[in-house]
């Protein structure tokens, strides 16, 4: 998702309009298709998927990489990106042919990572620090590796060696997965399944409308 101040993006859509020039607007937004676990996308690194959408989101509005001041990149499965790099934001922007001196930040906020990336871009623009930013989110759970315990590096003299599945419980140790906490919060605040279904339905209808209008 590319965000920009009203002043910065005026040239993309023509000057004028009723919006205040201090407003932050979404200029361009794209996404890759979904794939099933172990499906057609299982061998494609998430960094490649991230680079793909960065290139396309810029192409659609004819914006050059050097015009983007910061990229915020959300990724919630560090075990998968770790197969390629510990700094996915940097790698994805370079693969998307952004300038080598481009500023980027990687963040992990579990399921909210990509929306948090968009939010940080919004905040930076609103604070007057930048005028154009990218909010990106990419991961490929199908490529998450099985983990060898740390002691294996220094040798195992006796007994079996286990492999850990980083996706099982998404690696949560000592506290509940987010899905369990979400269920408990719903009970605490009296949010029924019907309430949640209505919210999900409304979200799907908004996407359907946006897709029909060519926004995605």
What do the PLM-derived regions correspond to, one by one?
Residues 47-62, 88-92, 117-120, 178-185, ...:
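Short, well-ordered amphipathic alpha-helical segments that serve as non-catalytic structural scaffolds
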Residues 71, 75-132, 172-178:
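Conserved catalytic cysteine-centered active-site region
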Residues 31-32, 43-52, 60, 195-216:
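N-terminal extracellular/periplasmic Venus flytrap/periplasmic-binding protein-like
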Residues 126, 131-185:
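Flexible glycine-/small-residue-enriched beta->alpha junction loops
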Residues 30-33, 74-79, 109-113, 137-144, ...:
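Acidic, glycine-rich active-site loops and adjacent beta-strand->loop/helix elements
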Residues 19-44, 56, 187:
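Condensing-enzyme catalytic core mediating Claisen C-C bond formation in acyl metabolism
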Residues 108-139, 186-215:
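Active-site-proximal alpha-helical scaffold in enzymes
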Residues 1-18:
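Short, Lys/Arg-enriched N-terminal segments with co-localized hydrophobic residues
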